[in-house]
Structure formats: structure tokens, C-alpha cells
Amino acid sequence: MTVIAQPGADVRVRTLSSEDEFTELADVWDDLVLAMTRPSPFLLHTWLREWWRHYANDGQLAIHVAYRGDRLVGALPLSVRRRHGLRITEFIGGWALLADVLIARGEDESVVAGALAERASTMDHDFADLYGLTGASRLVAALPPADFRLIERLEAPILELSSGWEAVSQSKLSPKARSMRRRRRRQLEAVGPVEVALARTREELAPALEEAFRVHALRWQGRNDSSEFATPVGKAFHRAALLRLADDDAVRLLTLSVNGKPIAFALSVQLADRAYGLRRAFDPAFGRFSPGSEAKLLSLEAAAAEGMERSEFLGAAAPHNVRFADTFDPICQGIGLARTPRGRVAVAALLAGIRIRRTLKRSATARRLYARARRLKGTRA
């Protein structure tokens, strides 16, 4: 364990390099997460620990923790992994959405964030690639702008639920959409008995999760799936993490079944009056009934009934999410803090690659819109 003194702030920073050291913080870690303006379930101690157990491989923990006296007042959960011969600093979790420096309530954010940011900027790495930050990140604010570039990657739509589901559904679903939903439900019921189940306890969740893996595999069969939800390691990780979180009543898995067979699910994690969408899928054999949309709506209704004030979709601005969005709070990728010549070259190449992909994506979108406009013009003519 490394101890580094921070001058003048009465804050000392340690770097934890072993899982055992991190495990010792289990009782106090989540208080830091709950103190976040936008609490991330992907920074909860259980989630991070299980992710590391399943995905560590040859990575090295570098969890920076800040103390004032004996009190834990801040943390920055990082790890260093080797990719393409480079030592790259990442958040534990890799895709730990909404990740940031953690700061205890009542602390001077500039002092704690500054101490942790200073430690991160002097790590033994080539560069840092931190995915999951937000535009309001306290870590980013504490880093020199010239050393760290923040790039928006996901639009992250948010739906406000505080007015109750009846009001939300009336405002978000047109009369035509509500009529279509009822019609498709009747069509589905003509196939066989329709059941809706909401798993939340460990005993309920264990079998429901296996069905979710099956449905997810059907949905993504033959397609590029980067979610890790259905890989052998991914399934083992989600079983371990979600079942442990279920002991804290934080998981909700809504399943839609026909003839006793699940055909769609919506999986979410609840934290601090917010529901965070984790995964949704449906059996494409039933696609004409829109079971994925129905499972999503039922999941949102259940969250509102429990008193959740907002639902975070955490993804891109896809049409099925945008139609429900009240606002957007984008998720970003932070790249920089290069410490070596190779790191500086890698940062420049990575940023250039992102710019090129964005340009190509915009160009492809523009071409599709132009082609569609031409078709519509021809139809009107």
C-alpha cells in the first residue's frame, strides 16, 4: 500500500493495490456512492468487486482513497491494464457508466477531488482512457484541460417519473400508440396466456436471470453484441453481482411470458430513487407483438409505482428511448494524462480515430436522410 501526503489540506491519499484491501472498505464505500449528485450503481462496492473478480486477468488495481484523519472522504476506483503493449488506466468495470471521483458529504470537493486527481495524473501508466464520465465530472474539473480530453459518447436519455405513471404515459404515449399497445396485447393473448412477473429477491431473480440470458441470446443471435451479457464470463459476473445486489433489494427483472415461456425482459437497478436500465431483450419469434416495448413500459410503470423519481436509459438516443426522454445527460469518454512518448502517440491516434468514426457516422446518416427525402419527393410527385 502506497501512502502519499497532500500538502496543506489535511487529506492523505492511499493507493489500494489488492482485492483484500478493497474488501475492507465494504461497509463505508457505498456511502460515497450515495453522496454523488448522480449516484452510479456501477460504482457500488459489490458491483466493482465482482467485476474485478471476473475480469481482472492481468490487470492491477489502483484504487485511490482519500482520508481525513480516520474517515474515508474520497475515492477514485481505477485499474491499470495492458493493451497493445501499453499500460492504460481505466475505471474498474471498464464500462462503469456515470463513473467519477467519489466525495463524502460535507467535504470540500475541490480539495478532495484535487488530491485524487493529482494522484491519478502521476500514475505509472502510458495514458488514461476513462469511459463513463459525465460533463459535470468533478474529476475532469480537477484535471488540467490541456492534459485530458472529454468526448461525448452516449446521449443518455432520462425520463422523469415523479408525476406518476398515469401522467407520464398520457404525456409520452399518443392515443394512437396506446391503442396500438392494447391491440398488440390482445393479439399476444390470442397466442396463449400472458404473464408478467417482477423478480427482486435472490430466490426470484436466480431462475429469471437464466431466462433473461436465453432471451438475450435469441435476440442477438448472428448479430454483433458487445454487451458481455451472454458470454460465459459475462453471465458468471452478472449472476454474482446481481444476486448480491438483490440482497439489498436493488435489482428488478421484469419478465413477459406467453404459455409459461419468457419472451421479453427488462432488467434494471434501483438506487437513490432512480431506476437505471441495465439490459432489455425479446425473442424475435414474437417480434410482431412488440414484446420488448411492452416489457419496457411495464418496467417503467412498476418503477413509478415504487416511488422512483426518474429512469435513466443510459444508452444512445435511439428512437425507442428518445420518445420517452424528458432530458439528456450525456456519458463521455475521457482520454489523456499521457506519461510517456508512446502514451502521447496513442492518445493522439485514439482521438483521431474517434473523430474519423464520428465524421463517417454523420456522413452515413446524412446520406440516408438525403435518400429518404428523395424517395419522399418522388412519391409526392
Regions found by a protein language model. Give the residues of each.
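Active-site/acyl-donor-binding loops of N-acyltransferases
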Residues: T2-V11, T15, E19, V80, ...
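A conserved beta-strand-loop-helix scaffold within acyl/acetyltransferase catalytic domains
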Residues: V13-G69, V73-I88, L133-E152, A156, ...
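Short, high-confidence coil segments that cap the C-terminus of an alpha-helix
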Residues: G59-L61, M123-H125, V251, A305-M308
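Aromatic (often tryptophan-rich) hydrophobic motifs at membrane interfaces
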Residues: A66-Y67, A96, E107-D108, V112-E118, ...
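Residues forming anionic-ligand binding surfaces in small-molecule and nucleic-acid pockets
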Residues: E90-L97
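The substrate-binding groove and active-site-proximal loops of carbohydrate-active enzymes
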Residues: A99-A104
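ATP-hydrolysis module of ASCE/P-loop NTPase motor domains
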Residues: S121-R138
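Long, C-terminal catalytic modules of enzymes
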Residues: Y370, R374-L376
